[in-house]
Amino acid sequence: MAPSRNGMILKPHFHKDWQQRVDTWFNQPARKIRRRKARQAKARRIAPRPASGPIRPIVRCPTVRYHTKVRAGRGFSLEELRVAGIHKKVARTIGISVDPRRRNKSTESLQANVQRLKEYRSKLILFPRKPSAPKKGDSSAEELKLATQLTGPVMPIRNVYKKEKARVITEEEKNFKAFASLRMARANARLFGIRAKRAKEAAEQDVEKKK
């Protein structure tokens, strides 16, 4: 039991014939094979649908440490589906993940995911339930012949970094106080309702005094 990181230094008191109870990991190679076989079986079962599952939305990682990166989320919000013109019940049947709990906090995230949905919808090859009687929105017979199973993630998400050229730091940038500005912005957001209420009460008192 070697010490791990910055924890307390242990003084273990072993009893119960502990050498017979050591947890071993000799099943790892077999587990790896079993997982691979399960993935292949699932891919065969759901073919010609994408092997990696439904399309996921672009979401920004939480906290200041990671919010510069984007990754795949759980599901598209109901607002995103509404703007894209896809019904929430239909979405799940055509390989679009839905998360009714998610809320869009910015216009940029909403627009990015709506665009993602529209692009996916344009590329989608939709098989008719009855081959003899295809419905509106189903793909043509020529498109169905071209259909192949996608092995990787559906429309993979990439982090794009823009390189900036080196330049001289301006005086305004030198004097800018980032931490104080963030604190002030948070305080203004927190006290917005209280200040609005006080301003309204003060305005009402002024009206009463004038009377």
UniProtKB/Swiss-Prot annotation:
It is found in: Cytoplasm. There is a cross-link at K123, K145, K174, K177 (Glycyl lysine isopeptide (Lys-Gly) (interchain with G-Cter in SUMO2)). The modification N6-acetyllysine is found at K16, K177. One of its GO terms (molecular function) is structural constituent of ribosome. PROSITE patterns: RIBOSOMAL_L13E. Keywords: Acetylation, Cytoplasm, Isopeptide bond, Phosphoprotein, Ribonucleoprotein, Ribosomal protein, Ubl conjugation. InterPro entries: Ribosomal_eL13, Ribosomal_eL13_CS. There is a cross-link at K174 (Glycyl lysine isopeptide (Lys-Gly) (interchain with G-Cter in SUMO1)). Component of the large ribosomal subunit. This is Large ribosomal subunit protein eL13. It comes from Mus musculus (Mouse). The gene is Rpl13.
